[in-house]
């Protein structure tokens, strides 16, 4: 990516089996679900920063340090002077997509994920740059946010920034945003958006956000709300994913994250056990009866479709699968 600079890394959005004799095992392909979007994006790079920072902090893997630094450089390139991020690059030269429906300056999903990644950059590498970029990008998520699943990412970003820097305003912001999430429920279930049903699990991190905020900042009522939603939504979902004909890795990752974080915040083994059941979806506890994580190749496939494993293998699936599988260790949910 010459336009992004020699140190920047990005991750191809999608890959699919070649299928031709003598061809490479996988071919990269762009995102074009809503017309042509691009070849790599901030959404995936930001998730991967969290993953690689975690691997470096927890295990000291040197290649993870290098990857996190390179992906942070890509995020820096994708941030405008006013603090907003655009999502996609159109090609491997690094030309930005500034006009797509899934790629424009300041889109809430990629703005929130980029801030989460910058908070992890601050905690992992220190220095002024990632803190400055976080501060510059923050105002763009401080307005009204109808998407409570995105707001959950904002909570995790603010909370991690506070843990990295001690900035009291970030802790205050995490509490305020957590209150917004806690106020939007249908019965005990935390909503993705006010009055929007049914609940989709893709990106559903509200239990994760509330359980961690409650534990770290001493707000037990947040833990209780997260526990109630986990009981009503996530524990049933841990078994739903074992039989459902169509399931995405990101759905399972969110189930695992919420249950693992509630388990840590309550010390109740029921939630850890449920997280383990959901995590087993990657290993063959699914309607296909076949692993979605291929241990031999290291790939996570793109999920179960009509009871069969899709052999496509995109960035989101691999990153979210890795985060879910890392939840099998005693530490906090990696998404935190």
Q: Language-model features: where?
A:
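Non-catalytic carbohydrate-binding regions of carbohydrate-active enzymes
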Residues: 1-3, 217-312, 329-336
